[in-house]
Amino acid sequence: MNLRRLLLGLLPLIAISFAEHSYGEDLTAEFDAKHKKCLERIAEDNELAFEEAMIWQDDGGGRRAKHCVAMALYALGHEDEAAHRLDALAKASDGGTPAMRADFYSEAANFWLVANKPDRAYKSATDGLDIKVDHLDLRIARARAYAMSGYYEYAEIDLTSVLGFDPKHAGALRYRADARLQQGRLSEAKADIENSLKSDPNAVETALLRGQINEAIRKQK
């Protein structure tokens, strides 16, 4: 699945996660509801969502408004600016709890990856992991940044760490299979890709990667 479409499809879940981490006197149910509505608006009309989010931000919408602005920018195709704003939000005085800041860094890292800027993705992911070392999405994002830069051994280390927390994580297994394929370790890549498909049998990208691994094994014989 295209990463952009996948991330946009997760907007409602992001809104729920944002609300679950909301603490403090200024984090009202009304603001949570407005943030959720703002994210949902992106799927309907991303230009209008951006305009409304900017107005809300100027009216004192705080981190929720800033977050929605960034997500709308991403939907409009401005991955760099969206990632930059999320990095800034994670560092800001109104960035929220450590868990929320880590989530902002995770979104930023994934947006940098879409923008094909692995160095920036690595920085965002590492900054997030400094806050929350067991954040699996951050560790996967950093592994993907390593792989995009050709550092497959380092990518494998991060992915193995993810699998230490969640041995059946389909995404981590798939990415590690690819890292091992790139290193020519075909039997290990084959084992990972089969386990990934067991965890998520309908994953098209995983099935395609299995085909590549099987072809590499065939050519090696």
Show which residues each predicted segment covers:
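Canonical positions in the second alpha-helix
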Residues: I55-W56, A88-L89, D127-G128, S161-V162, ...
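Structural signature of tandem alpha-helical TPR/SEL1-like repeats
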Residues: D45-L48, E79-R85, A115-S124, S149-S161, ...
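Structural marker of alpha-solenoid helical repeat scaffolds
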Residues: D58-D59, A92-T97, I131, F165, ...
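Helix-start (N-cap) detector for alpha-helical repeat units in TPR-like alpha-solenoids
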Residues: F31, R63-R64, A102, L136-D137, ...
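Residue-level recognition of tetratricopeptide repeat
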Residues: C38-L39, M71, N110, R144, ...
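N-terminal leader/linker segments that initiate helical-solenoid repeat arrays
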Residues: F18-C68, D80, H84
